[in-house]
UniProtKB/Swiss-Prot annotation:
S-adenosyl-L-methionine is among the record's keywords: no
This protein's name: Insertion element IS1 protein InsA
Function: Absolutely required for transposition of IS1.
Gene Ontology annotations of biological process type: DNA transposition
UniProt entry keywords in alphabetical sequence: DNA recombination, Plasmid, Transposable element, Transposition
Source superkingdom: Bacteria
Family: Belongs to the IS1 elements InsA family.
Transferase keyword on record: no
InterPro entries on file: InsA_HTH_dom, InsA_N_dom_Znf, IS1_transposase_InsA
Length: 91
């Protein structure tokens, strides 16, 4: 039987990661017992993937319009607006 080591994206721990149910789309969720963060490896919704927020901010800073950013990234225009609106808050 093959064993895959999954590390926490928040604290990088590998020994305290346990399975924590499934998402509504049926993807496996994981829980880190050290920092209590939950995550999943597969995403159904494109805007939930790690790095999406930073890509949206980078495209806005480089002069790409909101509609063009939404079309290129494959997310809705309201998602772009929400990310830009919340970019002043710490993430």
């Amino acid at each position: 039987m093959a064993s895959v080591s999954i590390s926490c994206p928040s604290c990088s721990a590998t020994d305290g990661v346990v399975r924590n149910g499934k998402s509504t789309a049926g993807h496996q969720r994981y829980l880190c017992s050290h920092c209590r963060k939950t995550w999943q490896l597969q995403f159904t919704y494109t805007a939930s993937q790690p790095g999406t927020h930073q890509k949206i901010i980078d495209m806005a800073m480089n002069g790409v319009g909101c509609r063009a950013t939404a079309r290129i990234m494959g997310v809705g225009l309201n998602t772009i607006f929400r990310h830009l609106k919340n970019s002043g808050r710490s993430r």
